[in-house]
Amino acid sequence: MLLYSFPGSPTLFYGDEAGVQGFEDPLNRGAFPWGSEDAALTDFFRTLGQLRRTRESLRSGALRYLLARGGALAIERECGGERTVTALNAGDAPADLTLAWDAPTAQDAMTGQRFLVIDGKAHLTLPPLNGVILV
C-alpha cells in the first residue's frame, strides 16, 4: 500500500504480485507461477493499480506525513482538492489512530469499509500488519 501511495512509479520485484518469494541462488530466479498465482494477492495488487490510476492525488499529489508513532504511519496525498490518506500498522499489536477528516465518513478504497467521523476526526483501529487507503 505504501509503495503505491508514495510519489514516483511503484516498482515490484518480479513475481511479488503473484506471491513468489525470494530465496538464495538459484531459486530466486525461478519461473513465474503461471496458473498457480496467489489469486488474493494478485487481486490486491490489481486493486492498488486501479486505485492509483483513478486517483490523481496518488499520481501527482503533494505528500504530507500525518502520523508516525510506533509501528503506525499515516500519509496524505492531495491534488486539486482530492485527498487520499494511507494509514498503516506495521506493528505486532492493534494501532488506534485518530485522523482529521472533513467528510461524514471515511471509506477504505481497498475494501469499501466505512469509518465513522466524529467532530471532524476519523477513528480507526488497524490490526497488526494491516492498512487502509482512505478516500
Give the positions of each predicted feature:
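Active-site phosphate/pyrophosphate- and oxyanion-stabilizing loops and adjacent acidic/basic residues
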Residues: 1
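Carbohydrate-interacting/catalytic domains
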Residues: 5-12, 16-135
